[in-house]
């Protein structure tokens, strides 16, 4: 099991990317020995307004999640069948190596779909720049569809050879599927 659970409240719990926040859950020992010293410098709580926004947003959480998960599975299936897509990484697909495990552990498979395209880095950027509904971002905290290129954003400080070993090629994209029709 997990000793610590970290939640971002920015995307799913907030629902609109209006707040920044999170929650850290752990044993009393972890909270006192590890987290408390950090909190003394940063403060342990978000603002009352952000807390209220998140609380209100939780009222629509089940509806939003149903839509996000359904859209993500549809997009993953579409990408998997497209000839310009090299591979799709999404646990909701039967082709995913851990699909059976994911079915046992999850009631839904999330809305983050990673995929690789055939082509050069320039081709990948051209693809991203031609998207009409999806916004390019390095922050995936919203209910609209957002895409990022990990090799030049989140993992840009890792040498290319190491990134490739980690499975983060120049053609890998991460798509946070939103609630659009």
Each model region followed by its residue ranges:
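Conserved PLP-enzyme active-site core in the AAT-like
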Residues: 1-84, 89
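Positively charged, small/polar-rich N-terminal and surface patches that mediate targeting and assembly
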Residues: 44, 87, 141-142, 148-150
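Short, glycine-/Ser/Thr-/acidic-enriched flexible segments
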Residues: 29-31, 95, 118-120, 152, ...
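Short, well-ordered beta-strand elements within core beta-sheets of diverse protein domains
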Residues: 53-63, 110-118, 174-178
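PLP-dependent enzyme catalytic core of the Aspartate aminotransferase-like
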Residues: 64, 129, 145-181
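Conserved small-domain helix->loop->beta segment predominantly found in fold-type I
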Residues: 73-141, 158-164
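Solvent-exposed alpha-helices and their adjacent loops that cap or buttress functional pockets
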Residues: 13-17, 44-47, 105-107, 139, ...
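Structural motif
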Residues: 3-5, 23, 52, 111-114, ...
């Amino acid at each position: 099991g997990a000793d610590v659970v970290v939640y971002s409240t920015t995307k799913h719990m907030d629902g609109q990317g209006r707040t920044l926040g999170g929650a850290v859950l752990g044993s009393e020992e972890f909270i006192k020995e590890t987290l408390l010293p950090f909190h003394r410098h940063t403060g342990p709580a978000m603002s009352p307004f952000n807390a209220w926004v998140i609380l209100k947003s939780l009222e629509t959480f089940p509806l939003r999640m149903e839509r996000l998960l359904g859209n993500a599975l549809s997009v993953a299936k579409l990408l998997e069948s497209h000839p310009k897509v090299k591979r799709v990484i999404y646990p909701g697909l039967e082709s995913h190596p851990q699909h059976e495990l994911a079915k046992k552990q999850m009631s839904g498979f999330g809305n983050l779909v990673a995929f690789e395209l055939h082509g050069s880095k320039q081709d990948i950027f051209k693809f991203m720049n031609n998207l009409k509904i999806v916004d390019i971002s390095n922050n995936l905290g919203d209910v609209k569809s957002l895409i990022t290129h990990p090799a030049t954003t989140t993992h840009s400080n890792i040498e290319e050879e190491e990134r490739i070993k980690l499975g983060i090629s120049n053609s890998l994209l991460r798509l946070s599927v939103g609630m659009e029709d």
